């Protein structure tokens, strides 16, 4: 009996590894280069753009040019009032909280880091408004290190495809993805999952008929059964 359980686990592991192999190979062939859709010029501007998110990147990109023109770096933003920042980002979601975070973040950068965004995962999380996901974005995008930021798209798509099992939190999803995706592809895979979730595997009505990885997708297979 115990042998059968062991064999069953081995089969499940093989299926999971095969799914990863097929899905990653598909993305590598069709999207060898994948990047964020946020527009920025340096780590500070990327951090500002990420902290301005929780809405579409397109919406963020509509407000950041004027914001960066007026406050291109931590020093200039640290001298701005919360109200001045608010006026420039008021068309995005939660502008009250975001303007406060941006102001406090810029001041913290000036006080503790000479205006330079730290390239350390733990230090990044000492900045106001910066949690694990944002710190991972900075690691992956700004500093080109292996990291897997888990936003709503990554969380949903990884679960639907079947890349994760029983993950209830972004951290659980992150750990499972990191355990199976080669480090050299980790940051790129983050973009693959985001873009796939944004344009194909959308939240309410996933476009399975347009999906190139449907044949390996757990969600699609359940629909067919």
Regions found by a protein language model. Give the residues of each.
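Short, Lys/Arg-enriched N-terminal segments with co-localized hydrophobic residues
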Residues: 1-13
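Catalytic cores of DNA base-excision repair glycosylases
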Residues: 15-225
């Amino acid at each position: 009996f115990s042998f059968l359980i062991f064999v069953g686990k081995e089969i499940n592991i093989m299926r999971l590894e095969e799914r990863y192999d097929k899905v990653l190979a598909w993305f590598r062939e069709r999207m060898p280069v994948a990047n964020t859709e946020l527009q920025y010029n340096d780590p500070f501007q990327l951090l500002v753009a990420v902290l301005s998110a929780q809405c579409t990147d397109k919406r963020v990109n509509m407000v950041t040019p004027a914001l960066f023109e007026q406050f291109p770096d931590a020093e200039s933003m640290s001298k701005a009032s919360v109200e001045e920042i608010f006026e420039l980002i008021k068309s995005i979601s939660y502008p009250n909280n975001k303007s406060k975070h941006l102001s406090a973040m810029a001041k913290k950068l000036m006080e503790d880091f000479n205006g330079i965004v730290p390239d350390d995962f733990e230090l990044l999380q000492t900045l106001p408004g910066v949690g694990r996901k944002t710190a991972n974005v900075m690691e992956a995008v700004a500093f080109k290190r292996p990291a897997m930021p888990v936003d709503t798209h990554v969380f949903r798509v990884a679960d639907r495809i079947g890349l994760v099992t029983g993950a209830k939190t972004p951290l659980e999803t992150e750990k499972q993805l990191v355990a199976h995706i080669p480090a050299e592809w980790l940051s790129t895979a983050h973009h693959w999952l985001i873009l796939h979730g944004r344009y194909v595997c959308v939240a309410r009505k996933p476009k399975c008929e347009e999906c190139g990885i449907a044949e390996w997708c757990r969600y699609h297979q359940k629909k067919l059964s």
